[in-house]
Amino acid sequence: SDGKDEIVVGTRADQLHAINDNGTNVPGFPVAFGGDVNGSPAIGDVDNNGDLEIVVNIGNGTVVALHHTGATMWTRFIPNANFFAPSPALGNVTGDAKLETFIPSSNGSLYGLSDTGADLPGFPVVYSTTTYTESSPVIADIDADGLLDIVLGSEEKYIWAWNRNGVVLAGFPLSTGDAMRGVPTITDLDQDGS
């Protein structure tokens, strides 16, 4: 609450750092985990209490949400899954003013987690039976129905899109003809309002 931004970054040395503008550690950091911190941390007010939380994926198949103090909010282990490059995405998909977490895993499934780390209804969803993705999900209202959707690129040459209930949107998956490792960008490029 000093009006200055901090830098939050994970390392291959199993730690999450939060660093002040003068190079010192934020109190409570670094936080140590039992695996590499992969991808970028996602930051938002997950529980709608006015404070920011941090959500990270750990290379051992764990998703962790932390309070801004570094204390653990919740931990969720995903069986048979190791996380690689993808970063979690946060969004108020259910409309309850709290943020849900979406993260793809190496077992070919996209997980949707509530503000407490529990599975959302309709999740996980399968995006691949043969491979994983290095892409991160994006949350946007791509069908212009006023509700947020989840979009993910895959190594199997498809772009997937699901609604908040885990139902694949009409017209998806879309074939791109090649694997995707980057994160999709969502915009109204033709400015037609959808």
Model-predicted regions and their roles:
Residues 1-194:
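Extracytoplasmic/lumenal domain signature
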